[in-house]
Amino acid sequence: MAKFAHADVLDNGPNYIKTNCNKMALISAYTFGDSYATVNAALLAEAAMASGDFTLATAGNDRTLTTAAGKSDASANASGGSASNHIAFVDTVASKVLWVTEETSGQAVTAGNPVNFPSLVYKSVQPVAA
């Protein structure tokens, strides 16, 4: 299962997600580097996001970005999904996929049913000497 962070996130850190993400999406499949259009085509459910839905913190020497718990879509857009589900954080204004991570429940989604998103953590770690 693929995970992804956009080059802008890698260059600017987790605050870039906090500042620019305006949608969290449950998608039915993801392959590393999938385009914004491909991610939207795999959309099962979505929730609007704002900078206040993210919390930046320090964990030891690392920086973490935690998403708010309790985000939901009252009515799933489509049916589908399985063990290959992912959660994508996108910037709809700039048409960018900012961050993609695995959705681990593996539950199928039925169109029209509610979908609850878990709280997730993006971690930016200190470099280590080789």
Task: Name what the model sees in each region.
Residues 1-85, 92-130:
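Small cysteine-rich, disulfide-bonded extracellular modules of the LU/uPAR three-finger superfamily
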